[in-house]
Amino acid sequence: MSSSCSGLSRVLVAVATALVSASSPCPQAWGPPGVQYGQPGRSVKLCCPGVTAGDPVSWFRDGEPKLLQGPDSGLGHELVLAQADSTDEGTYICQTLDGALGGTVTLQLGYPPARPVVSCQAADYENFSCTWSPSQISGLPTRYLTSYRKKTVLGADSQRRSPSTGPWPCPQDPLGAARCVVHGAEFWSQYRINVTEVNPLGASTRLLDVSLQSILRPDPPQGLRVESVPGYPRRLRASWTYPASWPCQPHFLLKFRLQYRPAQHPAWSTVEPAGLEEVITDAVAGLPHAVRVSARDFLDAGTWSTWSPEAWGTPSTGTIPKEIPAWGQLHTQPEVEPQVDSPAPPRPSLQPHPRLLDHRDSVEQVAVLASLGILSFLGLVAGALALGLWLRLRRGGKDGSPKPGFLASVIPVDRRPGAPNL
């Protein structure tokens, strides 16, 4: 295992070394042929690509007849630019002693790479992906080397870890994108992600330890629909499905939260449904409502998903029941003679309309349950006190001889022990 780790590490180091070889004379590993790189404020060496190393050449700027460096400089085929800046960028021409064109070199200035910013996220329990971005812009062509390895804990009381398994390449999907995907991950394992940024001036590595429990973030639910409830002008029914990326297994469940608001209203109302649908009972009649939903692991691992795209729905246009008339008004209204062909109108009911009580049902149920609980508690306390008093009196009645002076006032004098008979 350790041999495979060291082997792949040597391969990665070799690749990085080859990529950074641009700092050597006449590099060809980066960019188009003839482009060489340097850092602002540092000395830069350019080499003539068409001559043998060490052969003296003359250097000119492209389009300028002025000689920058002659063949007697003692620098051979190299041109040295002290403390290069942006004005030094451009194309240079080198000529041999016989005036033949040795080649052209284009100078591009930039900065060495810094450690990239890396973050990882898991959309399910089996796969996770990592993305990265440069912490500073180098201005140079840049490549990234990505790999990962798995770490296992030896014991709960041990702070040491077993040798890491891997590393393995983390394939970039698609190739060249700032994202790599790890397939077939283990939920209870920890992983170390290695992202190395490489450009012609160097390499910099970022290591990130992750666990699926902490980076789990499902995709938002799909298929959100909002429908009116016929005959209920203040109700909406919302339904949705699991995200397609979530595994269809009974022990991997999601919980949901739903938000809704009327049109032109900035504040959202939030509820946590128990399943894959929810009936909104306090919608504003006649107004369209925006609804959105998000998901999270049922055991609160990771974080909530992003919100789903909003879906819109308008409650039913059924008539809202009017207020119940007072008792006196019921008897003072003039009676209308029913027509022969039309059915008799229904008699007014003194009972409140059930729709008017929908929003008060839950409050009344809570009040009734609280009252029953208080009455039950008081009944238990009274029963306990009565039982204790009864047991105390019973023990007192079974006691043998009465205590001195006990009930002495109610015993006749002539029956007291030792009293003379008169």
Swiss-Prot record:
Keywords: Craniosynostosis, Disease variant, Disulfide bond, Glycoprotein, Immunoglobulin domain, Membrane, Receptor, Repeat, Secreted, Signal, Transmembrane, Transmembrane helix. A motif (WSXWS motif) lies at residues 304-308. Glycans are attached at residues 127, 194. Also expressed in normal and malignant prostate epithelial cell lines. Expression levels are increased in prostate carcinoma. SMART domains: FN3 (SM00060), IG (SM00409). Changing residue 355 to E: Decreases proteolyisis by ADAM10. Residues 112-219, 220-317 form the Fibronectin type-III domain. Residues 392-422 are cytoplasmic. GO terms for cellular component: external side of plasma membrane; extracellular region; plasma membrane; receptor complex. This is Interleukin-11 receptor subunit alpha. It comes from Homo sapiens.
